[in-house]
Amino acid sequence: MGTMTPAQRRALYESARFARETTYNGPLGPEYTPAGTRLQLWAPTAEQAAVNLYRKGHDSLCIGTLPLQRGPQGVWSIWLPGDQHGHYYTFTVTVDGVARETGDPYARAGGLNGLRSMIVDLARTAPAGWVRDVRPVIPPARRSVWEVSVRDFSQDAASGVRPAWRGKFLAFTQTGTTLHGDGIHPTCLNYLKRLGVGYVQLMPIFDFGSVDEAKPLLRQYNWGYDPTNYNFPEGSYSTDPARGEVRVRECKEMIAALHAAGIGVIMDVVYNHMYRYENVLNNTVPDYFFRQNEDGSLSNGSGCGNEFASERPMARKYMIDSLLYWAQEY
């Protein structure tokens, strides 16, 4: 295609021909089986695409790079034979001669700070009784909503939550906690049950960018409205953010505990912008997923520096796929 300016890309992406030739309705991301994993990446403007394999989600060298094969609608894919559970990967996508290493926009788990994607057997992340978990039916008289940040829910030592679980998903699973351990004033899950709330609305729990998961002792705080990976949980809310499967399992444990207490779960989502413009989506298909002005500059209706181009077919598909994934898997 040759080097294109943002304005030229905008014209391309909004053309009927581009939509007709590149809109893809099939599955994307990793498809795990014990026999092997297929990776599929939508990158229609790429000249080349490759997968980089790692043993760990951080601080390890690449153990191999393999080319992806281009297919219809600009979907690149590769089959990795053997049980790939627990292996980490990134993609290198070359557009206009510029190679960018990036995570998988459809990854189901990731390493420290979400910089590397992880292949995960989701069946291994299911807590005990997960297959029987169902959201409770909340009668009309109890349909009140209590909004909370996962961190704020239990971070204070006065919460009575065990230290390793404070500010984490697992704090929602601990029962019998009282203020300063006084045995009188309930906290956390016991407090919610006494309030009689019907639903807990969790402020963003998918992977966000402003908290460094590698520095848990550093005083850091954000509500989470700065997403970096839409399809797996935030690592700072897990007890071991370096192991990608832990955040998935512990998020499910939190949801199961709330359901067991008769409380429904509402997930606050942020699809209108991302933390940085250089992100897994923009590194894969530059300028496609974010709205531009006529001169190619970024539109900023979100007030956060970029705004999601939900009118474009594959951006809309991405949002819907992500929402369905959370609703069905969690």
Spans of features found by a protein language model:
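Structural beta-strand segments of beta-rich domains
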Residues: 35-40
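Surface-exposed loop/edge segments in extracytoplasmic proteins
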Residues: 58-66, 100
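Short S/T/G- and acidic-enriched coil/turn segments that sit immediately N-terminal to beta-strands
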Residues: 64, 74-77, 185
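Short proline/glycine-enriched turn/loop motifs at strand-loop junctions of beta-rich domains
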Residues: 42-49, 83
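Conserved aromatic beta-strand anchor motif in extracellular beta-sandwich/beta-rich domains
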Residues: 51-55
